[in-house]
Amino acid sequence: RDQRNQISFPDELQRMSDPHVVEARQGETEIFIARKNAHQGEISVLNQRISQLSSKINGLQGQRASKQELVKSYGEEVHDLKELLAEGFADKQRLRDIERNYAMVTGEIAALTSEIAGNEIQIGETKLQILQLKKKFQEEVAAKLGEVQAKLYDVSQRLLATRDKVARTV
């Protein structure tokens, strides 16, 4: 619950050398470590996914920037060819080829932009999964803590009753 790396048992429970108490402490410690490691492992996998998606986005953005430069170049070439065509110094087929290339690369930019957005959505969903995992873990820890505190209260009451009984018989 407090993001600790180990369980802190009450001093009275730490001092008890009864084999059942020692075994219970060890068991709870092992369960705690296993659950914490599993939780951290899940979060680590999700963080790696975010990192991979971020790297993919960077690559896609680089491709998009390159395509945008290409579109700019095609746009300038189309403009120049239209002027030359008007003066009779250019081939109409050449202009149509450049216009097709311009349209094709513009479509590729749109596809890259869409893919980037999809990856950004996946990052958001993965971050939400991490938050949900942390919340679920906290809820489980709080529930387990409540159970343990109830058991501890019960045991302490029985211990007090037993001590009282022993004190009266002595």
Write out the residue ranges for each language-model feature:
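Hydrophobic or amphipathic alpha-helical targeting/insertion segments
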Residues: 1-3
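Post-kinase regulatory C-tail/linker adjacent to protein kinase catalytic domains
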Residues: 9-17
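Long, charged amphipathic alpha-helices with heptad-repeat/coiled-coil character
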Residues: 17-169
